[in-house]
Amino acid sequence: MTILPISAFSDNYIWTFIDKIAGVLDCVDPGEAAPIIRFAQSNQLTLRTILLTHHHYDHIGGVDSLIKQWPSCKVYGPIDERINNVTHPIKQGQSVQVGSLHFHILFNPGHTSTHISYYEPQQGWLFCGDTLFSAGCGRVFDGTIEELHESLLLFKKLPRNTKVFCAHEYTFQNLKFAHTVEPCNSSVINYMQQILKQPSSCTLPSNIDLELSINPFLRTDKEQVKQYALSHGANSSDSLDVFKVLRNQKNSFK
């Protein structure tokens, strides 16, 4: 099985699993249908499964057209009335089998109130939608900042070699903010320089080990990150207080 990011909109990735022997493909968060239909038809593949992480349109917008094209396609997603056409509603603690893959469902609210992620422990793959980005994290919409903080703490506990399949190409912009928070972080500096050598390349998947070294939202226990937060109005150096300031500062960062 091959994993391929199919681009959608300006910066979305639709992560796609391709099994050419079986003649099928599966995808995560198809915000647009056309790129999937084109790819499937050009490779003579049938869409078997759709995995959804949350209700935002740039993640579910293609579902209606895709299930019209492939009516037998299974659609997994969180229990949320804002998402239509989910054939298999799922929640924390359940598992989903996609071909030979067995995904554990992780409940990760914060970005939205019902956000979930798909974790495949045997392969070490995490499909985390908009909860975790490389060097960043999602904004808070209808979830809470406390929930988002807890969701990222959960990701910190995953094995360090876990590959992180984020839904957006935000890495370089996130690194610029990370460099503002930790200007002496050599991992951030080196990664920025690496990306600048191939600025149009896909930076994903990332991995937990890398994120622990570059992502300020996973580094709230580090002294320089705490000092940044305290200098920008944090009530204390407690992890949640630091996280709140980081998220607020990132919201207006340009």
Curated annotation (Swiss-Prot):
Pfam families assigned to the protein according to its UniProt record, in alphabetical order: HAGH_C (PF16123), Lactamase_B (PF00753)
Cofactor note (record): Binds 2 Zn(2+) ions per subunit.
EC number(s) from the headed UniProt entry: 3.1.2.6
Protein family: Belongs to the metallo-beta-lactamase superfamily. Glyoxalase II family.
Presence of keyword 4Fe-4S: no
UniProt superkingdom: Bacteria
InterPro entries in alphabetical order: Clx_II_MBL, Glyoxalase_II_hydrolase, HAGH_C, Hydroxyacylglutathione_Hdrlase, Metallo-B-lactamas, RibonucZ/Hydroxyglut_hydro
Keywords, ordered alphabetically: Hydrolase, Metal-binding, Zinc
Gene Ontology molecular function terms on file: hydroxyacylglutathione hydrolase activity; metal ion binding
Residues annotated as binding Zn(2+) 1: 54, 56, 111, 130
Reaction catalysed by this enzyme: an S-(2-hydroxyacyl)glutathione + H2O = a 2-hydroxy carboxylate + glutathione + H(+)
SMART domains listed in its UniProt record: Lactamase_B
Record's protein name: Hydroxyacylglutathione hydrolase
HAMAP family: Glyoxalase_2
Residues binding Zn(2+) 2: 58-59, 130, 168
Pathway: Secondary metabolite metabolism; methylglyoxal degradation; (R)-lactate from methylglyoxal: step 2/2
Intrachain S-S bonds: none
Underlying gene: gloB
Summary of the function given for this chain in its UniProt record: Thiolesterase that catalyzes the hydrolysis of S-D-lactoyl-glutathione to form glutathione and D-lactic acid.
Cofactor (UniProt): Zn(2+)
EC class name: hydrolase
Any Gene Ontology biological process: methylglyoxal catabolic process to D-lactate via S-lactoyl-glutathione
Assembly behavior: Monomer.
PANTHER family associated with the record: HYDROXYACYLGLUTATHIONE HYDROLASE, HYDROXYACYLGLUTATHIONE HYDROLASE GLOB
